[in-house]
């Protein structure tokens, strides 16, 4: 994917929502399956944090097409994943600041907070 500027390691919920609406991004949920069952952002692909290394090729392929917006509950695990992905050469990824919790408060209040 060609991008004129270097993508930041983190992205605000509003900016993420804009990229998703434009079809330029895909959501990657790195929480555990039981958390995904509690609440999720529509269209997100569940890849628990522990499974990310085994699914690196899948993530690399997705990042060739769109920006990966990685999220978790509050943004800690997702930032760890984004830092790891960057070290593997996956540049088109960013962690959702505040995770699904801030997304619920700023973008979509229909997403349950927990």
Residue ranges of predicted features:
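Rhodanese-like catalytic fold shared by cysteine-dependent sulfurtransferases
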Residues: 1-25, 33-67, 76-114
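Short, surface-exposed ligand- or partner-binding patches at beta-edge/loop junctions that are enriched
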Residues: 71
């Amino acid at each position: 994917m060609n991008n004129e500027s270097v993508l930041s390691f983190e992205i605000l919920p509003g900016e993420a929502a804009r990229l998703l609406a434009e079809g330029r991004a895909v959501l990657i949920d790195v929480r555990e399956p039981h958390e995904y069952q509690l609440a999720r952002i529509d269209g997100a692909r569940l890849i628990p944090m522990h499974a990310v290394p085994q699914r690196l090729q899948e993530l690399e392929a997705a990042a060739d097409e769109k920006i990966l917006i990685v999220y978790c509950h509050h943004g800690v695990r997702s930032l760890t994943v984004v830092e790891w992905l960057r070290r593997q050469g996956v540049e088109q990824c960013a962690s959702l600041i505040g995770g699904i919790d801030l997304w619920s408060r700023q973008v979509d209040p229909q997403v349950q907070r927990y």
